[in-house]
Regions:
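Loop/turn elements at helix/coil->beta-strand transitions in domains of secreted/extracellular proteins
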Residues: 36-38, 156-159, 193-194
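Short loop/turn segments immediately following beta-strands, especially the blade-tip
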Residues: 114, 167-170
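Surface-exposed loop/edge segments in extracytoplasmic proteins
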Residues: 132-136, 170-180
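Glycine-aromatic-enriched beta-strand/loop faces of beta-sandwich-type recognition domains
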Residues: 97-147, 201-204
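Extracellular/lumenal carbohydrate-interaction signature centered on repeated Trp-anchored short motifs
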Residues: 61-71, 139-147, 154, 189
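Low-complexity, Ser/Thr/Pro/Gly-rich disordered linker/stalk regions
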Residues: 1-88, 92-95, 104-114, 174-177, ...
Length: 234
């Protein structure tokens, strides 16, 4: 497994091979850090040993697990112009000891999920243990004039707040999307620390309809625990 250092943290890049979501072909060479310390994620069209073309995706995860706090991703790229089959995920995802797939997950995603038109982004919270609840996600439309955006997850024991803002910033100015999920049931909010992940992939493994490769740059990731710390549910 390939590892790299980005924004002061060690990240493991998913090993090359086939698997979900998708399924897709994952390529550990599709993540790199440039001299300015920015992370590059690529979706590439590759000719394999048999002479056939195939699409390669990328995913990476922090070696550390993070708890309640403020998660911020500063992105460079036209996330509003993705092909309908392209997905960018900025998210928290459980390790097997925390819970199975479909639990303990918080997502910011930019995708149309194969649709030619309609919303192109969503925020989602998967429960700790209960079945998914109505209102645990929201879709919205991103329309940019430039390529710089900031996206945040504010995770507390009783609620999750997500924000998206124009530009790279640490304040709340130029916010274009805000969502707060406070279900009133502790089972509907993740409670345990998990790694942070980012991935760039293809919905159902379907190649981009426009045939174009994609590169997204993450200029910075930051985490700040809440002060004072937010207590978990008993």
């Amino acid at each position: 497994m390939t590892s790299l250092k980005f924004s002061g943290y060690d990240w493991d890049v998913r090993a090359s091979g086939v698997g979900g979501p998708g399924p897709n072909i994952w390529d550990e060479t599709n993540a790199s850090v440039d001299r300015a310390g920015r992370l590059h994620l690529q979706l590439t069209n590759v000719t394999n040993a048999a002479g056939d073309t195939e699409w390669h995706c990328v995913e990476l995860a922090t070696q550390l697990r993070f708890g309640f706090g403020r998660y911020q991703f500063q992105v460079i790229g036209r996330i509003d112009q993705f092909d309908p089959n392209v997905v960018l995920g900025l998210f928290k995802y459980p390790t097997p000891d925390v819970g199975p797939d479909g639990t303990n997950e918080i997502d910011i995603e930019f995708a149309r999920w194969g649709r030619a038109t309609g919303n192109n982004a969503d925020y989602v919270v998967f429960p700790q243990s209960a079945p998914r609840a109505q209102g645990d996600n929201v879709e919205f439309m991103v329309a940019l004039k430039g390529s710089y955006t900031t996206h945040r997850i504010l995770w507390q024991s009783t609620q999750v707040t997500c924000q998206s803002l124009y530009g790279h910033r640490d304040d709340d100015n130029n916010q274009f999307e805000f969502w707060q999920y406070a279900p009133g049931d502790p089972r509907l909010i993740p409670q345990l620390p998990t790694p942070v992940r980012m991935n760039l992939w293809l919905f159902r493994g379907t190649p981009p309809s426009n045939g174009e490769e994609v590169e997204i740059v993450i200029s910075q990731f930051s985490f700040a625990p809440f002060d004072p710390p937010v207590d978990s549910y008993a």
